[in-house]
């Protein structure tokens, strides 16, 4: 069974349709990713001056950091058409061919989750990216023949959260690789303040700070929290969102000061109380929480590891001193061998 949607999930949710209005429309409006923005601005200006298609661009980074938004901005700044799709949607080579043959000169084709393209589709994409040609096999058996179709010179913008899953031939064909990083609290404050202005709701500096601190370094989460806090402010007939309103709303939503939600705290508390802080294997945790293993590894643990609350050791999951302080619990004395580098992790 699919786990319920979490308020602090960086993945796109069905109720995120409202964040379209919050997205910046130009590079000058885009907050954060300063080096990436500066480089993109130069590459776009150079391509525009030469009247050429921009080199293919690859955005790499965790979900919710603005890869799709930046792809749209690239097309808008170039003044060209924009077509969007995703790796899992392009099931056959013919699906990709249909997309490519409908592109105009210098258009931008955006493929999200590009690491999920099938090998057969990738083979068709290589000559399209390199030579702007489609090399298709028509027919079967002895009657099969190769047909080359010239394409308009286009820009492929790929986005991936899993750069390690990209094949080397595909990765090497992107002339402009750009890595997006988590945002600072100050950058998220700017995003929240701008979002409040777009939504027509008042926002104090400390209110923006309170939302930004709990947004896990991710604009998508910041926008989602902002919309829910706005609901609390409207219900209270407040003129503006201040720290008190933001704290009340986010506490009601069970998002604490570190951005952890009820599931995060349940995970940490289970290890602390039931297993003495660890180490404990992931299969044991899956049984204890009644959650599938992949949900624990892909949804719950990454942020806890990033924040320094959790370690993955060869012997299992282990809480750090930081985690016990956050939970307000005394850290038990643990044998140094629990931090050992040898042996295999219990049912990991």
UniProtKB/Swiss-Prot annotation:
It catalyses: ATP + H2O = ADP + phosphate + H(+). Residues 184-254 are annotated as: Small ATPAse domain (RuvB-S). Mg(2+) binds at residue 68. Residues 257-348 are annotated as: Head domain (RuvB-H). InterPro entries: AAA+_ATPase (IPR003593), AAA_lid_4 (IPR041445), DNA_helicase_Holl-junc_RuvB (IPR004605), P-loop_NTPase (IPR027417), RuvB-like_N (IPR008824), RuvB_C (IPR008823), WH-like_DNA-bd_sf (IPR036388), WH_DNA-bd_sf (IPR036390). Its EC number is 3.6.4.-. This is Holliday junction branch migration complex subunit RuvB. It comes from Bradyrhizobium sp. (strain BTAi1 / ATCC BAA-1182). The lineage of its organism: Bacteria, Pseudomonadati, Pseudomonadota, Alphaproteobacteria, Hyphomicrobiales.
């Amino acid at each position: 069974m699919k786990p319920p949607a979490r308020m602090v999930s960086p993945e796109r949710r069905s109720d995120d349709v409202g964040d379209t209005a919050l997205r910046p429309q130009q590079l000058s409006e885009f907050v954060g990713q300063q080096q990436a923005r500066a480089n993109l601005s130069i590459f776009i200006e150079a391509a525009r001056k030469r009247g050429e298609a921009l080199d293919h661009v690859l955005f790499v980074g965790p979900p919710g950091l603005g890869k799709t938004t930046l792809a749209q901005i690239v097309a808008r700044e170039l003044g060209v058409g924009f077509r969007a799709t995703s790796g899992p949607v392009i099931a056959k080579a013919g699906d990709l061919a249909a997309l490519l043959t409908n592109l105009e000169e210098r258009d931008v084709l955006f493929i999200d989750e590009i690491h999920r393209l099938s090998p057969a589709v990738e083979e068709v994409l290589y000559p399209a990216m390199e030579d702007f040609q489609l090399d298709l096999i028509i027919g079967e058996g002895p009657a099969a023949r190769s047909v080359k179709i010239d394409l308009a010179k286009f820009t492929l913008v790929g986005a991936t959260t899993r750069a390690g899953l990209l094949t080397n031939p595909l990765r090497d064909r992107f002339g402009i690789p750009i890595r997006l990083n988590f945002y600072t609290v100050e950058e998220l404050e700017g995003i929240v303040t701008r979002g409040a202005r777009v939504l027509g709701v008042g926002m104090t500096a400390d209110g923006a700070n309170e939302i930004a601190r709990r947004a896990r370094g991710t604009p998508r989460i910041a926008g989602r929290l902002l919309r829910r806090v706005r609901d609390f402010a409207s219900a209270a007939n407040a003129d503006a969102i201040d720290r008190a309103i933001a704290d009340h709303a986010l506490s009601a939503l069970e998002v604490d000061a570190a951005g952890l939600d009820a599931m995060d705290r349940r995970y940490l508390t289970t290890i602390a109380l039931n297993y003495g802080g660890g180490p404990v294997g992931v299969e044991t945790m899956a049984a204890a929480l009644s959650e599938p293993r992949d949900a624990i590894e892909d949804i719950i643990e990454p942020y806890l590891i990033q924040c320094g609350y959790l370690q993955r050791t060869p012997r299992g999951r282990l809480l750090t001193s930081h985690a016990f302080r956050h939970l307000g619990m005394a850290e038990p004395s643990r044998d140094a061998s629990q931090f050992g580098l040898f042996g295999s992790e219990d049912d990991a």
